Amino acid sequence: MMEYIDISILNPAEYNPRLLTNEAQEDLKKSIKELGIIKPIIIRQSDKRIMAGHQRTKTMKLLGYTHVPAFILDGVNSTDEVRFNQLHNYAECELSEIQPEINVSLPKGTEGFYTVSNKDISILSKGGNNSRVVDLTKMILRYGQFANAICDHTGKVIISTVYAKTVKLLGMDLLVYVLPEGKEEIALKYFSKEYGVFE
């Protein structure tokens, strides 16, 4: 379940391998200014350590945010911490033709975070990435849900489609972020960028 957490109590993980270039930092600032925080970070319950979302947290601090949306997970081992980071970053780069096509039913005028019941999630085409579904399934069953999907105002999922498919197949409800009308291209532009370089 997503919660809003005081950003000042969060601790960065030592293993985070990505460094932000100045250009990427500016792009990330622009995306947050234009879209807001549409993707929660992942933190560890025991010590509030960030497992995924380091660069966005850093940028939110620079922009003056005091609270951040986060999934809080308990009992995560060190191997799975790194795995969460990888899965989280993969969702930023999954914009390809082999993705499943997913629609969700939304009340008219819905914007921002919204929980969609499982019966209101429709898989229109299965796409590929069955191995990714298996990976996501293992992590969700072990720790609970840790991500959201992003959809346009009509309910078409445009980012994190594989995650949405996995949640549907597991019979669970799905947290989505519903973009305001006309913001789809902006979101796709920013999510197709690489925010950070690996050391």
Would you name each region that the model predicts?
Residues M1-V178, A187, F191-F198:
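Short, charged/polar connector segments at secondary-structure boundaries
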